[in-house]
Every structure is written in structure tokens, then in C-alpha cells.
């Protein structure tokens, strides 16, 4: 038994070989909330950001368990100021989980995983972390739940709590009044939504680093987590050994604007791909026309449908309209194998059978139920992204996206009452770095963080390697040989020695050919 520790001896658990199930999915677990509504220290010669005051005491890890893991790990808590500019306002508690390295003498620079969303808890990535067997041979892996989600003083508002809602209430339609009500509920709890921003979490990461007395760390960010990782690199480059960005969100991206364009482009590309495929046309002869026919049929007030809730088996009814249909289709786009179900879903719906659509929607929603905090999602996007979208840009977006424009309009309306964050002048500008090696991973079929974002980000990172996986959607690191690629990079910190066979496999990968493997007979 390998034992080591801070406060007391720690037992290194056996690596978990179970299936991966987390928030945004690369192939399978798609995020229903992700990106739905979804400078100083630029260069080495610049002066790094000032160090925050170190924690008054070191972290004390104790044995613990997470619902997503069958093995025991270690957990700790760290109190940090709610508002570092006004420490008299009190503190909140961060939760840090550690999957220890399988060695008596781990390297002094652990790998920190930064989750997506915004709003996803890092603890939801525990199965992914446990599966990084090669990385854990030498290094601890740390999961820091961002303030406001998971076990880090989570934000709570009944208006956005979907745990007890019927399936008919879990779609996007009507989200704006719920978000506004959530804001009121947070204020009633004396919660300041602006305490829960990206840069506050960046400083929390630095506080954890100082508390653990780590000279440097390796960062992996997925989706929104890439924004956090890049901002940490911008402010603390001297403490970053390697940086891996997967599903890259370029600093210039405004979630409340760009996500809708990316989703619309991916939906159109999927429809065109289906129409060009003989096997797909056998399932649905004209998918674009089929979708438009359904949208016209479901124009408000829509259609009253009866169905059995796939979670409970209970009979329910739902007033389904065109916006709800489009909202329910969005999660299918995140991964090629689920996107390939679109023709079957459309064909069934044309025949007034909405069960496949509702079942898929519930599957994705259930996956994220305990992983995403919608209140934190809006606290960040409404304060940091929505204010950077001009009225003219909103109007242009709505006019250019006739299919999903109404959904975009709801996301804008949801943010109307939220306060605007005061952000530094370098916010939204490229992160410039000449020294830290950066690995950027993109899925060619990603509907929300397309490869163009990674290419844009890479332009100001001197030491970078950009890999685009041909047949993968959102998040590459969980697919095929990518965990071994990540392990090799973190071990060597050398972009020129990445395993060439794995790189070629990812770059030449093709999407699954599921058009010819229908879940139901062709019409």
C-alpha cells in the first residue's frame, strides 16, 4: 500500500476503469446548459500580476467519496474571500478533490482539471480524472469546484431547480422569466451575483496553489474551462508548466452571441450532410424541409401532445411549440453519434411521434442534472458576456438566424436584470505567451467551440500545437488515444515529442456511419 499525505497518511486508490460520464460530452454526455444561452503579463517581459495574500493555513486533505466514483479519494476545503476588494464581506468555502498519484514521490506540479459550462462542477470530471491512468503514475490530479457550483458554496434558486420538474418543464422555452426570478431569489439571500465571476475563480485557483505550496501546475481546461485556464495563464504565467485547452473558447468569444451562430452553422451543416447521403435520405428524404414543416406546424400556440415520461413512465401532456422543438434538438449536435439520429427523430415527429425526441432530451438533461448549476451559468454569462453584445449585433443575429433566433432572443432577455461585471481592460483580448507550451484540441464537428476558435487563440501563443480531430464533436480528451496524448504532453512538457500515431489517428478520424444503422425502420 502506498501511503503519503499532508495531514495524515493517504492511500492511493486503484485507477478506475469504469465508463466516463460527465457534463459536456465528447461523443456521449452532452451539456444542455453549456453555452446555450451555452494586458498585464501578456509577455515574459511584462510584470506578472501581483500575488494575492497566501492562505493562512495549508490545505488539510481527508478521505472522501464522490458520487461519480466508486473509489475513495481525498478532499479538502479552503475559505476564500467573497470579494477580494472587500474582504470584510466574509468568505465562502471552496471544495478541492484530489486523486493521488500512484507513487510515493509524485511530481510537485499536479494536473488541475477545469470544468465547462459555465456552471459545471469539476467534481463531475472525477471519472475522467480516474481514467487518466498514465498521468496519475506521476502526478496528483486536482478538481476544484468553481465558487457557486458543486460543493463550493453552490448558488441555489428554486426558479431554476429542475430536479422536481416534469419533463415538459425542462426545455428552454420560458427560461427568461425563470432567470429573472432566480436573480430576485439570490438577492433575497443577500448573495451578490458579481462575486461569482471568472476572474474570482482564477484567484481561487491561485489561492489553492499557494495553500499547497506548489511552484507550478499543469492546467487542463475543457470548454468554458479554457477561458478560466487562459485567464490564469494571462495573470500567472510563471506558475503554469503546461496548458491543455480542449474545446477552446477564444477570449474574444461572447457566449451569448457566438454560441448561437456556431449552433446554427452546425445544424445547417448536418442537414446538408444528410441530404447528400443516400443512406440518410432513405431515413428522411428531405431533412431541411422536414424540419421547416415541423416548425411551421408547431408555430404558437403549438400542438398538445401526450407521452409517457421516460424517467417515470407517467402519462403527461405537453404543449409543444417550434421554439421547444429547436431547443430539444440542440443537445443532439454535440456529438456525431447523437447528431446522426436527427433524420429518425424528424421522421418520427412528422408522423406525430415525439417520443424519440423527448427521450433523447431527457437523457441529456438527466446526465447533467447534478453537474451543472444554472444559477452560476447565468451569473457569469449575464455579467460577463451579454453586456459585450451591442443592440445592433443582437438584431443582426436574430435576422440572420431565422430558425433559432427566437431562442437567442430568450437568452438575451434572461439577462436584462442582472448586474454588469467590471472587467479589466485586457478582458476579451488575446492571451500572449512565449514560454508556456500549449496543446490545443478541437473537434471538427464541435457545434459550440469550433476549430476556428482554437486557431484564433493559438496565434499569440508561441509554443503551441493545434490538433483538430476530424470525426469528433465537443471535447476530444476523452476519445480514443487522447488520454495517452495528454499524459505524454504533461509528462514531457514537450510539444515536439507527442506520439505521432495518436496525433494522426485523431486528425484522420471520421464520424460514425450511423445513417445506415437506424433505430427505427425507414419510411
Predicted regions and their residues:
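Gly/Pro-rich cap/lid or specificity-loop segments adjacent to the active site
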Residues: 49-324, 379-523
Amino acid at each position: 500500500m502506498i501511503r503519503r499525505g499532508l495531514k495524515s497518511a493517504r492511500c492511493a486508490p486503484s485507477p478506475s476503469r469504469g465508463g466516463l460520464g460527465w457534463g459536456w460530452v465528447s461523443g456521449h454526455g452532452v451539456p444542455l446548459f453549456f453555452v446555450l444561452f451555452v494586458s498585464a503579463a501578456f509577455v515574459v517581459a511584462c510584470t506578472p500580476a501581483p500575488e494575492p495574500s497566501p492562505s493562512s493555513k495549508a490545505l488539510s486533505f481527508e478521505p472522501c467519496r464522490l458520487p461519480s466514483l466508486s473509489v475513495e479519494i481525498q478532499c479538502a476545503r479552503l475559505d476564500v474571500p467573497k470579494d477580494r476588494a472587500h474582504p470584510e464581506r466574509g468568505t465562502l468555502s471552496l471544495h478541492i478533490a484530489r486523486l493521488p498519484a500512484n507513487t510515493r514521490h509524485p511530481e510537485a506540479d499536479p494536473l488541475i482539471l477545469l470544468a465547462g459550462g459555465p456552471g459545471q462542477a469539476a467534481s463531475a470530471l472525477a471519472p475522467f480524472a480516474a481514467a487518466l491512468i498514465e498521468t496519475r503514475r506521476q502526478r496528483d490530479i486536482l478538481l476544484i469546484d468553481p465558487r457557486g457550483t458543486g460543493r463550493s458554496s453552490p448558488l441555489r434558486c428554486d426558479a431554476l431547480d429542475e430536479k422536481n420538474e416534469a419533463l415538459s418543464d425542462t426545455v428552454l422555452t420560458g427560461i427568461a422569466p425563470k432567470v429573472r426570478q432566480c436573480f430576485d431569489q439570490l438577492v433575497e439571500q443577500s448573495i451578490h451575483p458579481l462575486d461569482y465571476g471568472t476572474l474570482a475563480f482564477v484567484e481561487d485557483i491561485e489561492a489553492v496553489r499557494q495553500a499547497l505550496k506548489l511552484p507550478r501546475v499543469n492546467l487542463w481546461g475543457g470548454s468554458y474551462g479554457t477561458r478560466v485556464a487562459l485567464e490564469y495563464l494571462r495573470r500567472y504565467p510563471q506558475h503554469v508548466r503546461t496548458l491543455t485547452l480542449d474545446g477552446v473558447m477564444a477570449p474574444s468569444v461572447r457566449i451569448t452571441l457566438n454560441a448561437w451562430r456556431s449552433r446554427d452553422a452546425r445544424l445547417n451543416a448536418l442537414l446538408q450532410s444528410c441530404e447528400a447521403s443516400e443512406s440518410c435520405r432513405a431515413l428522411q428524404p428531405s431533412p431541411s424541409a422536414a424540419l421547416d414543416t415541423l416548425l411551421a406546424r408547431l408555430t404558437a400556440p403549438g400542438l398538445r401532445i401526450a407521452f409517457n415520461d421516460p424517467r417515470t413512465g407517467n402519462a403527461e401532456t405537453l404543449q409543444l411549440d417550434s421554439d421547444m422543438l429547436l431547443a430539444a434538438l440542440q443537445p443532439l449536435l454535440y456529438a456525431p453519434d447523437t447528431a446522426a439520429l436527427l433524420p429518425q427523430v424528424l421522421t418520427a415527429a412528422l408522423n406525430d411521434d415525439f417520443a424519440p425526441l423527448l427521450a433523447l432530451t431527457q437523457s441529456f438533461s438527466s446526465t447533467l442534472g447534478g453537474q451543472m448549476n444554472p444559477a452560476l451559468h447565468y451569473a457569469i454569462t449575464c455579467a460577463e458576456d451579454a453586456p459585450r453584445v451591442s443592440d445592433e449585433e443582437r438584431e443582426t443575429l436574430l435576422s440572420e438566424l431565422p430558425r433559432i433566433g427566437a431562442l437567442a432572443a430568450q437568452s438575451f432577455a434572461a439577462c436584462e436584470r442582472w448586474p454588469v461585471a467590471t472587467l479589466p481592460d485586457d478582458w476579451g483580448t488575446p492571451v500572449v505567451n512565449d514560454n508556456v507550451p500549449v496543446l490545443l484540441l478541437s473537434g471538427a464537428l464541435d457545434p459550440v467551440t469550433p476549430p476556428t476558435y482554437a486557431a484564433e487563440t493559438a496565434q499569440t501563443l508561441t509554443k503551441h500545437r493545434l490538433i483538430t480531430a476530424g470525426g469528433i464533436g465537443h471535447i476530444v480528451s476523452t476519445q480514443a488515444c487522447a488520454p495517452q496524448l495528454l499524459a505524454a504532453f504533461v509528462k514531457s512538457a514537450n510539444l515536439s515529442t507527442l506520439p505521432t500515431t495518436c496525433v494522426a489517428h485523431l486528425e484522420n478520424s471520421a464520424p460514425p456511419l450511423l445513417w445506415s444503422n437506424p433505430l427505427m425502420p425507414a419510411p
